[in-house]
Curated annotation (Swiss-Prot):
Residues recorded as bearing N6-biotinyllysine in the entry: K557
Source species taxonomy: Bacteria, Pseudomonadati, Pseudomonadota, Gammaproteobacteria, Enterobacterales
Cofactor: biotin
Keywords: Biotin, Ion transport, Sodium, Sodium transport, Translocase, Transport
Residues in Pyruvate carboxyltransferase domain copies: 3-263
Disulfide links within the chain: none
Function, as annotated: Catalyzes the decarboxylation of oxaloacetate coupled to Na(+) translocation.
GO biological process: sodium ion transport
Reaction it catalyzes: oxaloacetate + 2 Na(+)(in) + H(+) = pyruvate + 2 Na(+)(out) + CO2
Protein name listed in UniProt: Oxaloacetate decarboxylase alpha chain
GO MF terms held by the record: decarboxylation-driven active transmembrane transporter activity; oxaloacetate decarboxylase activity; pyruvate carboxylase activity
EC numbers: 7.2.4.2
């Protein structure tokens, strides 16, 4: 049986390797060559690409999809869809899910890999049904993980539930690289033995087991696998396409792909990747810590980046050790977007504040309340009681609690566009959906769609040289220099030669607040993380009780409620919505 290959170079490869920064201008020159290979599909959209396009790159993600479809008409295009979360970080009403899928199909999408971070089939149902109703390929997903709560029967039951919902195929998504070769063989064998379904396997290379897992799955009868072109593979990413093609050549599983065509593509990306060196993670080789922490590749690079922004890069090992503990408290949920971000952020909070759950992120509370769906086992009862505050957890499908919201969203976006003088796209619904998924970031993108200066600068293939070089450095050292407004970290040897040059971590979007509480004025309320003030809730002179929410901080793409550690009167509010703050900055005081 021939094995179908899905190459993830245009989506998950760069999401895992360099924080989803690959630009459309670096995709289109190689698109015709990719289209000529004969892949089963090309993953090129969804996941974090939508967010990255509008947050960092200043690209319209809908335009990206149309351009890729135009450039690659022969190969099915594939995306990753987060079920009821779509591409955002909350559940959306069914009418929004239906319209989003419709527009994705109209813009060129063929294959939808639909997953739910909780492995709750109820959260995948609306999206899967919408995909099939619009004539596209609906692929249900098992988000693979291990824990005392997960057995072979867990995956067989979920497979059966997805088949009852209605799917065209099923993917096993090993986002952390923890699927062992023998477990892959058993899982694929047992699913194939019991069900007539096309089966696909997605693995990450982070722990070093992915290539072996793919081979054992192929022996067991898997129909297709994900790989990435070699120059965009390995470490946080995926097994190399060429290696698997060569391995299977001449066997009953021969992929039929031409390795010379693949090598030309690899050569192209080998050069393109150099532009994005500033966003690369630190991993060299494999990382066995993932076998314990179960952190997906993309999450690991994001954690490194986010800890740098918090001036806490040295805390990575502590955070990795805390992640499994948080995961257990949250019912052994899988670590895949958005739960990976939620667990990671909570672990960072627990480490940086020096006290577990001193601060509970809004999204962590949502999982404890049941707002994201069923957890594999019950969550920590004490934590749940703390966030419920006497209320009851959600037990139904979370989206059943949501009223239709598309009409209201559309009216709101059109109103804001008129007020701000924004020209909406020809198909205005695409812009409406962009803002629906990312209200603040989406609106900012629409305001600056034709203003590249509002986004990250274009990546540079060649490292810039300092404007001036010290005539005679006193000794070797590491310095930060600014070149054309961009900061670079430079390592200078004893002889004055520059042996390393990388982009420095960007600063917060605006000048951080630097406020200090006057002596004796009360107890300062400080920022546990670096980020931006989302909303100030407390008012000057207000009397608050212990546990009352004072303000909401946006950090690491999550909203963190800052609560009063004691009863008191609010004095000296030092921040407003939109302000950037650093760790430890005083936000207000409680007298």
């Amino acid at each position: 049986m021939t094995i179908a290959i899905t190459d993830v170079v245009l989506r998950d490869a760069h999401q895992s390797l360099f924080a989803t920064r690959l630009r459309l201008d670096d995709m289109l020159p190689i698109a015709a060559a990719l289209d000529d290979v004969g892949y089963g599909s090309l993953e090129c959209w969804g996941g974090a690409t939508f967010d990255a396009c509008i947050r960092f790159l200043g690209e319209d993600p809908w335009l990206r999809l149309r351009e890729l479809k135009k450039a690659m008409p022969k190969t099915p295009l594939q995306m990753l869809l987060r079920g009821q979360n779509l591409l955002g970080y909350r559940h959306y009403a069914d009418d929004v899910v239906e319209r989003f899928v419709e527009r994705a199909v109209k813009n060129g999408m063929d294959v939808f890999r639909v997953f739910d971070a909780m492995n709750d089939p109820r959260n995948m149902k609306a999206a899967l049904q919408a995909v099939r109703s619009h004539g596209a390929h609906a692929q249900g997903t098992l988000s693979y993980t291990t824990s005392p709560a997960h057995t072979l029967q867990t995956w067989l039951d979920l497979t059966e539930q997805l088949l009852e919902t209605g799917v065209d195929s099923i993917a096993i998504k090993d986002m952390s690289g923890i699927l062992t070769p023998m477990a892959a063989y058993e899982l694929v064998s047992e699913i194939k033995k019991r069900f007539e379904v096309r089966l696909h396997l997605h693995c990450h290379a982070t722990t070093g087991m992915a290539e072996m897992a793919l081979l054992k799955a192929i022996e067991a009868g898997v129909d297709g696998v994900d790989t990435a072109i070699s120059s965009m593979s390995a470490t946080y990413g995926h097994p190399a396409t060429e290696a698997l093609v060569a391995t299977l050549a001449g066997t009953e599983h021969d992929t039929g792909l031409d390795i010379l065509k693949l090598e030309n593509i690899a050569a192209y990306f080998r050069e393109v990747r150099k532009k994005y060196h500033a966003f690369e993670g630190q991993l060299k080789g494999y990382d066995s810590r993932i076998l314990v922490a179960q952190v997906p590749g993309g999450m690991l690079t994001n954690l490194e980046s986010q800890l740098k922004q918090q001036n806490a890069a040295d805390k990575l090992d502590q955070v990795l050790a805390e992640i499994p503990r948080v995961r257990e408290d949250l019912g052994f949920i899988p670590l895949v977007t958005p739960t990976s971000q939620i667990v990671g952020t909570q672990a960072v909070l627990n480490v940086l504040t020096g006290e577990r759950y001193k601060t509970i992120a809004k999204e962590t509370a949502g999982i404890l309340k049941g707002e994201y769906g069923h957890t594999p086992v019950p969550v920590n009862a004490a934590l749940q009681a703390r966030v419920l505050e006497g209320g009851a957890p959600v037990t139904c499908r979370p989206a059943d609690l949501l009223k239709p919201e598309l009409a209201e969203l559309e009216a709101d976006v059109r109103r804001q566009a008129q007020e701000k003088g924004i020209t909406l796209a020809g198909n205005a619904i695409d812009d409406v959906l962009t803002v629906a998924l990312f209200p603040q970031i989406g609106l900012k993108f629409l305001e600056n769609r034709n203003n590249p200066a509002a986004f990250e600068p274009l990546p540079q293939a060649e490292a810039a040289q300092p404007v001036a070089k010290a005539e005679k450095p006193a000794a070797s050292g590491i310095y930060t220099v600014e070149v054309e407004g961009k900061a670079f970290v430079v390592k200078v040897s004893d002889g004055g030669d520059i042996s390393q040059l990388t982009a420095a971590v960007p600063a917060a979007s605006s000048a951080p607040v630097q406020a200090a509480a006057p002596a004796g004025a009360g107890t300062p309320v400080t920022a546990p993380l670096a980020g931006n003030i989302w909303k100030v809730i407390a008012t000057e002179g207000q009397t608050v009780a212990e546990g009352d929410v004072l303000l909401i901080l946006e950090a690491m793409k999550m909203e963190t409620e800052i609560r009063a550690a004691q009863a008191g009167t609010v004095r000296g509010i030092a921040v407003k919505s939109g302000d950037a703050v650093s760790v430890g900055d005083t936000l207000m005081t409680l007298a």
